From Swiss-Prot:
Intrachain disulfide bonds: none
GO cellular component: cytosolic large ribosomal subunit
Keyword Ribosomal protein part of the UniProt annotation: yes
Keyword Membrane among record annotations: no
Protein name, per record: Large ribosomal subunit protein uL22
Gene source species: Mycoplasmopsis synoviae (strain 53)
Amino acid sequence: MAQQAKAHVKMQRVSVSKAKLVANLFRGKDATLALGILHNTPQKSAKIFIKLLNSAIANATNNHGMDASKLFVKEIHVNEGPTLKRFQPRSQGRAYEILKRTSHFSIILEERA
């Protein structure tokens, strides 16, 4: 089995459905190509993925001695985190619930043969 480099980030204030749309853009691509795609993606979750991908590349080169130019995104997971519940006051004593959703991201890089 080839060596793998991992990076995780939790409790990010972006919904899972919106983050998965961005994750699907670079799943299976080379790491350098994925960074280029993310830099040209205007979504909020793209900035989180840029930091996460840079962290995974640094883990691969520093901890495992892998070549950064041969890395590709083997797996990427976007999972649902805890939902923060807030209330918006409305007229006549009512309150509407506002759900602030969070996400957990993880990425696994591997060296191409």
